[in-house]
Amino acid sequence: MSNGEFIDQYLLPESGAILQDYLDDYFYTSWYTGNRNLIQLDHYGFPTASNFELNPKSTDNCGTVDFQGIPWGNKAIGKRKNFRLYRLHTYSLSCNHSDWSPEELSLDTVQVAAEDSFYEFQRFLKNPNCLRNHHHLCKSVKVVGEHSVIYVSNNSIRMENTLHDNSVQIIDLKNNILQKKAISCLDTTNAVGCLGTLYGQYCIFNFKNGSFSTRKLSDDSINHIQLFSEKKFILGCNDGAVYVEDVQRTSPILVYRCSNAVNCVQLFDETPLALVCTDSKDAMLIDIRSNSVSAKLPHSDSVLTGSWHPNGNILATGGQDTTAKVWDIRALGKSFRNLGSQMSAVTNLCFSPLGESLAVTEQADFVQLFDTKLFNTSQVIDFFGEIAGTAYSSSGDSLFIGVDDPMLGGILEFRRPLQHPLSFIF
């Protein structure tokens, strides 16, 4: 097969483009092996969703149906592996620091486990309209309990019961947030939730009775929110500020100001040590009592996300350099694992509640699950679409992935088998 050259007049889609744009270009490359004359188009000339839905009356369902119900292998759309190769070769990456290349990254060798070895595919719900309003802020999906998925949809927060495929609106902010598609980040506890916007507002809400309160913090985006009690949360902002908010106070407390935009800030329980990830090449451990930097954790490009292991000794950071690094807080001289992504920037990291696995979420198409015993075995979850967020259930038995795409989006659910191989040390 050739390298999939483009006909000259067709351009690569930009970062964060919807799948419809990629598919429209894909059909004019040598990767495509289907029949363009069979593709159904809308009045703008773009392929419609009907091309990627199984037609039970058709005699052309000779291929395999993937997680998203796409009937790959039929005469119209061709083989799945060809579109996967196209995405891998053409997906647009952005960077803030240009003095590095993927070839220079020193990555650990990881054994890819058999499909469904850690978590098995359970269901794909197409009705939820999950939104991620910035391609690096993959923080729009949370889970309460075992089956209630909280997600961002337009200017509202909705809750999906995945057992019954039933979605209800928790709060509608269209009259409280002036701009459309403004919600940038989300976090929840068992009783309340909190969200931030791209325009400096934040909102705390009760998803059981629908009550909420909004406040204005600044004119810059709030990039991350973490609730560490039902009345306190920490915020990371695009102007470099880190705030702690107590809802009983009249204004938040500025605890640190970075020289770059803060993409993620994570406190471990209620300790004073915060993991702060910024647009610089370093994540930082900051003591919020003394406003001092305890350690720097280097990457090759902007650091977008971080997460603490439940034991408090291990943490992970990920960023635009397409790596996830794992650190031991007792020996921070260098990361002890350097894990590579499959296609794009690492935008979300989360350990399972008991710490057996680490979910490494990319900007699009891939979530990798690493066994935290040695971080040398992974399960690769492969689908298509920009990722709105990834979250474990409270027990860690289920993993939910929000896919933001108007044609192929929804919520993917994976469930741990009764006999599972995951284990961990530390």
From Swiss-Prot:
Keyword Isomerase: no
Signal sequence interval, chain numbering: none
GO cellular component: cytosol
Record keyword Cytoplasm present: yes
Pfam families per the UniProt record, alphabetical: WD40
Location in or out of the cell: Cytoplasm
PROSITE patterns, per database record: WD_REPEATS_1, WD_REPEATS_2, WD_REPEATS_REGION
Record keywords, A-Z: Cytoplasm, Repeat, WD repeat
Cross-referenced InterPro entries: WD40/YVTN_repeat-like_dom_sf, WD40_repeat_CS, WD40_repeat_dom_sf, WD40_rpt
Domain of life of the organism encoding this protein: Eukaryota
WD repeat ranges, renumbered to this chain: 217-255, 298-337, 341-380
Disulfide bonds: none
Name assigned to this protein: Uncharacterized WD repeat-containing protein C2A9.03
Taxonomic lineage from the root: Eukaryota, Fungi, Dikarya, Ascomycota, Taphrinomycotina
